[in-house]
A protein has these predicted regions:
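Acidic, surface-exposed loops and disordered segments
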Residues: 1-173
Length: 173
């Protein structure tokens, strides 16, 4: 099978991670894959904010959980690393740009044996006082919205490959 297709077919969202740390070398490869994603008119107005400090990860998870009235133990599934992808609020391509970058991140992580999951709840609560204060402290510009968070870590168990619904494909003659 084509190795690119094999990587796409085996990538799954991982929601349970081990304590193993991601090396800086692997993290740099993942980030390089992300920044090489397409962006509208190649403007590359996004920002990739990497957090490996567990206290900061839990601080953000707790604030998001509180805002969304989630379980007190909300923790992004216990990843080693998170990458917040943000873009200018007035950029009409911001969501698409960050989504493309996230997919590249997920595929590169999968290729390296690193699990990932897309956390998307932050986009609607970025400007709540507590959340914005944290984002500012992480260096995310005031005029940015966080379109997604890539949570990364080594999977606790192997990915289960499930078939997808291929009936959604329609050809027009």
């Amino acid at each position: 099978m084509n190795p690119v297709l094999q990587n796409i077919l085996t990538r799954r969202s991982v929601r349970a991670f081990t304590d193993k740390k991601i090396s800086r070398e692997d993290l740099n490869l993942i980030l390089k894959a992300g920044i090489y994603a397409p962006s509208g008119m190649n403007k590359q107005t996004w920002q990739f904010t990497v957090i490996q400090n567990q206290n900061k990860i839990q601080e953000l998870a707790k604030a998001i959980g509180k805002s969304l009235k989630r379980d007190a133990n909300y923790n992004f599934y216990g990843p080693d690393t998170i990458i917040l992808l943000s873009n200018e609020k007035d950029n009409s391509n911001g969501l698409a740009d960050c989504s493309s970058a996230l997919q590249n991140i997920f595929l590169m992580a999968n290729e390296l044996g690193i699990g990932s999951c897309w956390i998307n709840q932050l986009k609607t609560i970025c400007d709540e006082l507590e959340i914005r204060s944290l984002l500012n402290s992480y260096g995310i510009p005031e005029n940015h919205i966080v379109w997604g968070i890539a949570v990364l870590g080594y999977p606790e168990k192997p990915n289960e490959i499930k078939p997808k619904n291929e009936s959604v494909i329609k050809f027009v003659d």
